[in-house]
Amino acid sequence: MGLPDGSDQGTHQTQALLSAAQEMELQRRDYHVERPLLNQEQLEDLGHWGPAAKTHQWRTWFRCSRARAHSLLLQHVPVLGWLPRYPVREWLLGDLLSGLSVAIMQLPQGLAYALLAGLPPMFGLYSSFYPVFIYFLFGTSRHISVGTFAVMSVMVGSVTESLTADKAFVQGLNATADDARVQVAYTLSFLVGLFQVGLGLVHFGFVVTYLSEPLVRSYTTAASVQVLVSQLKYVFGIKLSSHSGPLSVIYTVLEVCAQLPETVPGTVVTAIVAGVALVLVKLLNEKLHRRLPLPIPGELLTLIGATGISYGVKLNDRFKVDVVGNITTGLIPPVAPKTELFATLVGNAFAIAVVGFAIAISLGKIFALRHGYRVDSNQELVALGLSNLIGGFFQCFPVSCSMSRSLVQESTGGNTQVAGAVSSLFILLIIVKLGELFRDLPKAVLAAVIIVNLKGMMKQFSDICSLWKANRVDLLIWLVTFVATILLNLDIGLAVSIVFSLLLVVVRMQLPHYSVLGQVPDTDIYRDVAEYSGAKEVPGVKVFRSSATLYFANAELYSDSLKEKCGVDVDRLITQKKKRIKKQEMKLKRMKKAKKSQKQDASSKISSVSVNVNTNLEDVKSNDVEGSEAKVHQGEELQDVVSSNQEDAKAPTMTSLKSLGLPQPGFHSLILDLSTLSFVDTVCIKSLKNIFRDFREIEVEVYIAACYSPVVAQLEAGHFFDESITKQHVFASVHDAVTFALSHRKSVPKSPVLATKL
């Protein structure tokens, strides 16, 4: 037995030594790359670059064929694709149990959220039936539970309360206040569905990407606070005035505080008992969720128990506890939306449409990622829109999906929207036969159901701490969205938060991180010298990079930051150079003027000398020596004038910084790393051309590196390249540009071998 143990120990030691040797080998492993130095022209030739072939997608869209029609049908009615292939044995039992569990939650939430929307409870059941069945036909998510949702209900409630508070508005509809609220709600649902279907058909599902996660979470948190405030009147049993618009939450809280002496004790006790019972059941479900096949239906049991106690004890008569009252049974015929309300509701409808879709698609993507399938955002928009659009004809109010019900649908074995269809059929049974049994249900119990279900959204206050550590800008978005939604109401708050979020995007694009790059030793990698102490600037070469793309909003800032990082006051140096050149030119002009005057004097002297042909021989002879001396002297003066003119013509213009007595930059080449550019506009092109011009004025050659082909094509289309700036100034990488700048300063680009040791 000892021998095998020793051999095993030796084997383990050998394996450990081998793994250590392999690790050291990996750490020492180098590779050697040898390739030509490539500028853009050479790269295009080597890679056979050419514009991508244009695909006429519109031809495919408008092509008529049986296959195309079948594909469109399956795309827009997904149930026809997956239902024929539904694995009954594997999934049906789970979907049935899941649908029953969701329906048990859907019933109390539908009744409660109808009150939240300012409507009779029965309309909450309608909104839990029609839209759910429509989504079963057109939706692509297998797990989300469509129906009433607190945030949507409070948004609808704010609209119904604000409009019906005006007596003239109610009289204009020729209806009671309750009927007017119903008309506003189902007309609003029709408009919301119209917006969602229209946006989905034109593939505007990407719009929701502009609603960041901090914005959506903050908005739903603020909405949950408004939900909580709106339920205080049912908890305390007090009558409140209708407040709408900015600061309505503040006014409501102040009025609740003023009305506290009129609290109905029986209502408060009922709400507290129901709330405690719901919390205990939820805690029990969380603790025993692994042992229980289905969660305990705490909400349904609470509603049944509260209804029985209220009926037996006569809470309404003896303790003045408000109850739901008469609930009509049976389905109601469809009605047309009130077209005269369209202009009044269009703004609120668009806000509700965006929020509802944002919540639905975010939950849908979470479950799709968890279970490995794909959710089509555009089809989801159409499906949710049809749910609201058709629901509007059957007097439903706008719906979305609920996180709590969706989690129950997933955790209880739901695999497809068959679970949703089962839950809608169960709700149909309640509507047709059992709805009237809940007429003695206390409204305080429904308020307790709503408040307890806000637990998940109230937990989102913890985002403040996590965002403080992770990203202060996202925290700012969260806080601004929350405050704006609380103070300005849901519709204006959403608009303010979206505008603020987009404004922050613009500001962050205008304030990118600018850096000077240095080479990491023995590599072709270049990093920010301020962050990497081992990265060293290449002598004579300055490499500059921005963390954001360059466009009209930050082009000037890019140019200013470049000059600042280079440590050279380019504008001042150019101004001084121009002044020195102008001064030199003025000096040359003065010299030319002086020489010109000398020339004129000499010419006058030459022209004054003449020979009189009539002089006698004796005069000529006597003046021969004298005349020859004068001619020699005059010839010398003429030669001086000619030579001075030639010197003026050949005098060089001294324009270099050194000859002008100006300081020279500490580098001879500037490389712009444009790897972060995703597009360019005309302002960007003009800014880059100005950079080339200005730095060449101070004797610094400029190169571009790591520019993607689409951006190069845009530069070419914008007439960036000309005789002075060619594609030979654009290089495949920063290292190519650095190598060229060091070895080919102010020369025609060639193709030396670039050897890089890594």
Swiss-Prot record:
Q: Which UniProt keywords apply?
A: Anion exchange, Antiport, Cell membrane, Chloride, Chloride channel, Cytoplasmic vesicle, Endoplasmic reticulum, Glycoprotein, Ion channel, Ion transport, Membrane, Microsome, Phosphoprotein, Transmembrane, Transmembrane helix, Transport
This protein's major location comes to: membrane
Q: Which GO terms describe its cellular component?
A: apical plasma membrane; basolateral plasma membrane; brush border membrane; chloride channel complex; cytoplasmic vesicle membrane; cytosol; endoplasmic reticulum; membrane
Segments forming domain STAS:
531-741
Q: How does it sit in the membrane?
A: Multi-pass membrane protein
Q: How is it modified after translation?
A: N-glycosylated. Glycosylation at Asn-174 positively regulates its chloride oxalate exchanger activity.
* Record topological domains on the Cytoplasmic side: 1-117, 209-263, 314-340, 402-417, 507-758
Location comes to: Cell membrane; Apical cell membrane; Cytoplasmic vesicle membrane; Microsome
The entry summarizes the disruption phenotype as follows: Mice show an important decrease in salt absorption in the intestine and failed to develop hypertension on a high-fructose diet. Show a reduction in pancreatic duct fluid and bicarbonate secretion. Show enhanced oxalate absorption in the intestine leading to hyperoxalemia and hyperoxaluria with high incidence of calcium-oxalate stones formation.
Per the record, which residues fall in region Disordered? 585-608
Tissues where this protein is expressed: Expressed in kidney (at protein level). Expressed in spermatogenic cells. Expressed in intestine, kidney, testis, brain, muscle, heart, and stomach. Expressed in the submandibular and sublingual salivary glands.
Sites carrying sugar chains: N174
Catalyses which reaction(s): 2 hydrogencarbonate(in) + chloride(out) = 2 hydrogencarbonate(out) + chloride(in); oxalate(in) + chloride(out) = oxalate(out) + chloride(in); oxalate(in) + formate(out) = oxalate(out) + formate(in); oxalate(in) + sulfate(out) = oxalate(out) + sulfate(in)
What Gene Ontology molecular function terms does this protein carry? bicarbonate transmembrane transporter activity; chloride channel activity; chloride transmembrane transporter activity; chloride:bicarbonate antiporter activity; efflux transmembrane transporter activity; formate transmembrane transporter activity; oxalate transmembrane transporter activity; PDZ domain binding
Which processes are annotated in GO (biological process)? angiotensin-activated signaling pathway; bicarbonate transport; cellular response to cAMP; cellular response to fructose stimulus; cellular response to type II interferon; chloride transport; epithelial fluid transport; establishment of localization in cell
Residue ranges, Extracellular compartment? 139-187, 285-292, 362-380, 439-485
Superkingdom as given in the UniProt entry: Eukaryota
Stretches that traverse the bilayer = 118-138, 188-208, 264-284, 293-313, 341-361, 381-401, 418-438, 486-506
Q: Which cysteines are joined by disulfide bonds?
A: none
Among InterPro entries, the record links this protein to: S04_transporter_CS, SLC26A/SulP_dom, SLC26A/SulP_fam, STAS_dom, STAS_dom_sf
Induction remark: Up-regulated by dietary fructose intake (at protein level).
**PANTHER family, per the entry:** SULFATE TRANSPORTER
| Summary of the function given for this chain in its UniProt record | Apical membrane anion-exchanger with wide epithelial distribution that plays a role as a component of the pH buffering system for maintaining acid-base homeostasis. Acts as a versatile DIDS-sensitive inorganic and organic anion transporter that mediates the uptake of monovalent anions like chloride, bicarbonate, formate and hydroxyl ion and divalent anions like sulfate and oxalate. Functions in multiple exchange modes involving pairs of these anions, which include chloride-bicarbonate, chloride-oxalate, oxalate-formate, oxalate-sulfate and chloride-formate exchange.
Assembly notes: Interacts (via C-terminal domain) with PDZK1 (via C-terminal PDZ domain); the interaction induces chloride and oxalate exchange transport. Interacts with CFTR, SLC26A3 and NHERF1. Interacts with AHCYL1; the interaction increases SLC26A6 activity.
Q: Which NCBIfam families match?
A: sulP (TIGR00815)
Entry protein name: Solute carrier family 26 member 6
Origin species: Mus musculus (Mouse)
What gene name is listed for this protein? Slc26a6
